[in-house]
Regions:
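Non-catalytic effector/regulatory segments
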Residues: 3, 33-34, 51, 93-98
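Alpha-helical segments that scaffold the active site and NAD(P)H-binding pocket
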Residues: 25, 53-54
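Conserved catalytic core of two-component sensor histidine kinases
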Residues: 18, 45, 52
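Aliphatic-rich helix starts adjacent to a transmembrane/signal segment
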Residues: 31-48
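Periplasmic/extracellular, small/polar-rich flexible segments of pilin-like filament-forming proteins
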Residues: 57-142
Length: 142
């Protein structure tokens, strides 16, 4: 007498595998999201270093730092474009759309502060770079 043996998986086994894959996918998406956020913040900090180097060159040429105004500024696309402008700004290529940050520079010509504001997520992440400190400082919303 011959038995009919059908090999395969039960519905319960398939459901367990699908549930495990779902949990692993969720963890991966969360980890990837925080990775891209930290990458954007690092890129913004690097851009601020690039702006600072351009400021050093500008100071060597004109005996003052380039600023957009003396009062605290709010970084927008317009203020970022002023920094990029070769005639009116520092003339450095900033890929602000790729890193999702806007920049502005304020000060009195003998000192300057660079501000960066996130253009993604909650849009409250702000990074500040001062001539005195020479490092980028993030607020608590980053």
């Amino acid at each position: 007498m011959r038995k009919n043996l059908i090999a395969g998986f039960t519905l319960i086994e398939l459901l367990v595998v699908v549930a495990i894959l779902g949990v692993l996918s969720a963890v991966g998406i969360i980890a990837f999201g925080s990775y891209t956020t930290s990458t954007k913040m690092s890129a913004a900090s690097n851009t601020m270093q690039q702006i600072s180097l351009a400021q050093t060159e500008h100071f060597a040429d004109s005996d003052s730092y380039w600023v957009d105004g003396t009062s605290v500024c709010t970084p927008t696309e317009a203020t970022t474009k002023k920094i990029i402008d070769e005639d009116k700004g520092l003339g450095i290529p900033i890929s602000y759309k790729d890193i999702s940050f806007y920049f502005c520079i304020y000060g009195d010509g003998t000192d300057y502060t660079i501000k960066a504001l996130a253009d993604y997520g909650s849009k409250d992440c702000e990074i500040t770079f001062t001539l005195a400190d020479q490092k980028a400082v993030r607020n608590d919303k980053c």
